[in-house]
């Protein structure tokens, strides 16, 4: 019996050494914001490798004195070094004990405990939303309370929650180095002592003095105040509006004029078609302006033949008699009379004939050579007149005329 007991004792010693060799998690820390709680810890991965897992449990602190302790398990065999306790429904004013242990290859480490009270340890968040609105030369600031994980106001858990408001003029203090401070527990705050038509920037912080809790400030928001409008600005607005109205009227008139002109040129062009074209385009009934571009089915088709009229070529033969050597003396008076008569019929008087008449009227004798030359000149003038008349008739007769049958 003694030998067997000694063997059992020797066998249990290595197991105790193995249990003691697994270290505990270190540096338990809580990351909190309003009612969001996350427990984190440190672990040296070189001791056991990646096969280690962790278990997290919690229990109300007043139950620690009871003989039977009932722990609530949150995270079991997790490989991460953090555990989210937000969904555990921890009361904000309660006090709890959190514990963590490591497990590897069926061996567990010792538990590591940490006390936690949300009312004391949980951080306070900034306002969930901030809105600015100008009211004359003042600014209204609307502040929305910080929210819990269930989207309820934190004032349900923190009764004496209030806000610290920092505001400054952006033109006088661009960096906000010397802001004005205003504390208020109201959700609607009016900033006093502001100037009209000035830009102001605002930052807000949540505060809880009982446990000395302060949140971070919100991002700066800027808004311009209003006030009575100066007369110069009113006149400027009026002038600009008048110019805009004038330009609109001018553009509208120009557009209407262009439209009217285009419409008039389309339907009533200034250049009319010739009458001989319009009579074929318009209806033949009197007083009708309807175009007759499409022929009615009842109208008979008109067939036209092409007729060409050419002038008849007439050859004119002119025989010039030989010059007379010496006309008889008794024919001198008849020859002069014939010359004057022929000149009167043709409407053209020769120079020589005129000079001969002047010579005869003056009583000077006319030589036979001069009479012969005058007669030849008169015949030449007649032939030129007949040639020009034939040329004019030939020009008039040339052309092609179409006649509809």
UniProtKB/Swiss-Prot annotation:
Glycosylation sites: 27, 70, 212
Chain positions covered by the region annotation Disordered: 325-374
Ranges of biased composition (kind: Polar residues): 348-359
A GO CC term assigned to this protein in UniProt: plasma membrane
Domain Fibronectin type-III: 22-123, 126-228
Main location: membrane
Keywords: Cell membrane, Disulfide bond, Glycoprotein, Membrane, Receptor, Repeat, Signal, Transmembrane, Transmembrane helix
Subcellular location: Cell membrane
Membrane-spanning residues: 234-254
Subunit structure: Heterodimer with IFNAR2; forming the receptor for type I interferon.
Protein name: Interferon alpha/beta receptor 1a
Native species: Oncorhynchus mykiss
Lineage: Eukaryota, Metazoa, Chordata, Craniata, Vertebrata
């Amino acid at each position: 019996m003694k030998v067997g007991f000694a063997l059992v004792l020797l066998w249990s010693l290595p197991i105790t050494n193995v249990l003691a060799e697994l270290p505990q998690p270190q540096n338990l820390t809580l990351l909190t914001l309003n009612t969001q709680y996350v427990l984190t810890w440190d672990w040296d991965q070189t001791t056991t490798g990646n096969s280690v897992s962790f278990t997290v449990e919690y229990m109300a602190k007043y139950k620690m004195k009871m003989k039977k302790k009932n722990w609530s398990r949150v995270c079991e065999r997790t490989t991460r070094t953090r555990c989210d306790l937000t969904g555990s429904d921890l009361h904000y004013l309660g006090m709890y004990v959190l514990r963590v242990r490591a497990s590897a290859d069926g061996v567990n480490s010792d538990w590591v405990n940490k006390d936690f009270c949300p009312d004391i340890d949980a951080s306070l968040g900034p306002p969930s939303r901030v809105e600015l609105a100008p009211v004359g030369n003042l600014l209204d600031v609307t502040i929305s309370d910080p929210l819990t994980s269930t989207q309820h106001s934190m004032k349900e858990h923190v009764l004496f929650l209030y806000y610290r408001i920092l505001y400054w003029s952006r033109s006088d203090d661009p960096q906000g180095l010397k802001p004005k401070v205003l504390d208020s527990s109201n959700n609607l705050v009016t900033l006093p002592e502001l100037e009209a038509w000035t830009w102001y920037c605002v930052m807000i912080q949540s505060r809880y003095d009982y446990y000395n809790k302060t949140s971070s400030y919100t991002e700066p928001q800027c808004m311009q105040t209003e006030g009575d409008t100066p007369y110069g600005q009113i006149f400027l607005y009026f002038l600009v509006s008048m110019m805009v109205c004038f330009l609109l009227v001018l553009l509208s008139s120009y557009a209407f004029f262009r439209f009217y002109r285009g419409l008039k040129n389309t339907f009533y062009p200034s250049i009319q078609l010739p009458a001989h074209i319009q009579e074929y385009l318009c209806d033949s009934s009197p007083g009708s302006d309807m175009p007759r571009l499409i022929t009615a089915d009842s109208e008979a088709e008109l067939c036209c033949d092409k007729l060409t009229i050419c002038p008849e070529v007439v050859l004119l033969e002119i025989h010039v008699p030989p010059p007379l050597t010496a006309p008889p003396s008794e024919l001198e008076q008849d020859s002069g009379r014939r010359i004057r008569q022929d000149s009167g019929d043709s409407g053209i008087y020769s120079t020589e004939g005129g000079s001969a008449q002047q010579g005869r009227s003056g009583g000077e004798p006319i030589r036979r050579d001069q009479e012969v030359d005058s007669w030849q000149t008169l015949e030449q003038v007649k032939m030129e007149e007949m040639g020009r008349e034939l040329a004019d008739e030939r020009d008039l007769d040339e052309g092609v005329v179409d006649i509809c049958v």
